[in-house]
From Swiss-Prot:
Residues 1-65 are annotated as: Disordered. The lineage of its organism: Bacteria, Pseudomonadati, Pseudomonadota, Betaproteobacteria, Burkholderiales. Keywords: Ribonucleoprotein, Ribosomal protein, RNA-binding, rRNA-binding. Part of the 50S ribosomal subunit. One of its GO terms (biological process) is translation. This is Large ribosomal subunit protein uL15. The gene is rplO.
Amino acid sequence: MSDIQLNTLKPAEGAKHAKRRVGRGIGSGLGKTAGRGHKGQKSRSGGFHKVGFEGGQMPLQRRLPKRGFTPLGQHLYAEVRLSDLQALPVDEIDVQTLKAAGVVGQAVRYAKVIKSGELSRKVTLKGLTATAGARAAIEAAGGSLA
């Protein structure tokens, strides 16, 4: 192992290839047509179809029906787990606290606590809603929803 040194490292034989230099004379083997063949759309500069083009046939993206939509207010609502509340260092929790801790995004206006994970300490929720199971878990730990 002592033979290997940083200044003696070389790539394996055949691992490196010279860059193809096309259109640089007959002797290179890639002169004249530069590997593009003769005539036709693909031989010309800028000559290629757009993505999804199927030669005039109705493209798949237009053959299939439109489906579904994204609700405009989707980013306004967020779900928060009990385990997320357990990890927070504060006892009074509202949407601003959740944003500051990075639990929910900055665009969120309303958050709902769901029963996922464990809560073993007393927390007070302000301006948040909760599922029935989450509410029971919060109250069992001595917490409340204001």
